[in-house]
């Protein structure tokens, strides 16, 4: 099914320029949205809790900062870019009491709306503007006069202005320069979660760890295993990112290409596909989100346990040591080895 695309000529920037926008959060996406909207002539305020470490950064950038409640009361368009697990409480405590007839509440991801964790009043426009790239790229492309493709969706539209407003907002952060795709909260949420769990985060992580274990258990040095299954992964992903799977296969050796064709289906087989379908079903029917909410309500104990277990895997010890030899790699603050 063909998607509906929009570009600069399809969006009226004056719509968002005539509104007052509150951006809740100043992380990766929050800083890109706030600064780019401001540079597009939009009146913007940033909502951050008292004592937030991001407050000085936003203020140094010349942005007006208030608490989430303060900026929500001031604004008529609110973009909620706090972490998924914090959004429901921010909505209940800070946003909902300050919503007025005709306001718009936008999101960068649809989870809380799609799964009913946030239930907004009927007189508020509910929409999504979601750039398909990290915030630093969104901002850099905007400054360079370009843009990152974005998604828009409208879930609730009491005044019939939602799509025009979302397109205007997307233009304000550079999205329509590249192209904006119209989707739904359901489609964006379920595809995003599936991609993260089955392929990008969960699937890739387990593939790498298992490959490392197989090599080390067969007697190969952990350092050699690390280079082959993790370090070189970036080279392959970069090729796929730039030109698809065909570009990757064109760029690697014939030996690597031929071996990949033969062995790839032995690793990812019909059974894997069936299990991926089960993961998708758990996402669609809300099983995953129920567990996510239970984890948060339980003080993140399950998540912390999984993090600890993951951090203790031998590949992490080996990787920390080897990355210390790589002057071109920015080592994260979690590594002290």
UniProtKB/Swiss-Prot annotation:
Mg(2+) 1 binds at residues 192, 196. Its cofactor is Mg(2+). Its EC number is 1.1.1.86. The keyword Phosphoprotein does not apply. Pathway: Amino-acid biosynthesis; L-isoleucine biosynthesis; L-isoleucine from 2-oxobutanoate: step 2/4; Amino-acid biosynthesis; L-valine biosynthesis; L-valine from pyruvate: step 2/4. Mg(2+) 2 binds at residues 192, 228, 232. Residues 184-329 form the KARI C-terminal knotted domain. Substrate binds at residue 253. InterPro entries: 6-PGluconate_DH-like_C_sf, KARI, KARI_C, KARI_N, KARI_prok, NAD(P)-bd_dom_sf. It catalyses: (2R)-2,3-dihydroxy-3-methylbutanoate + NADP(+) = (2S)-2-acetolactate + NADPH + H(+); (2R,3R)-2,3-dihydroxy-3-methylpentanoate + NADP(+) = (S)-2-ethyl-2-hydroxy-3-oxobutanoate + NADPH + H(+). The active site is at residue 109. NADP(+) binds at residues 26-29, 52, 54, 84-87, 135. Belongs to the ketol-acid reductoisomerase family. NCBIfam families: ilvC (TIGR00465), PRK05479.1 (NF004017), PRK13403.1 (NF009940). This is Ketol-acid reductoisomerase (NADP(+)). It comes from Nocardia farcinica (strain IFM 10152).
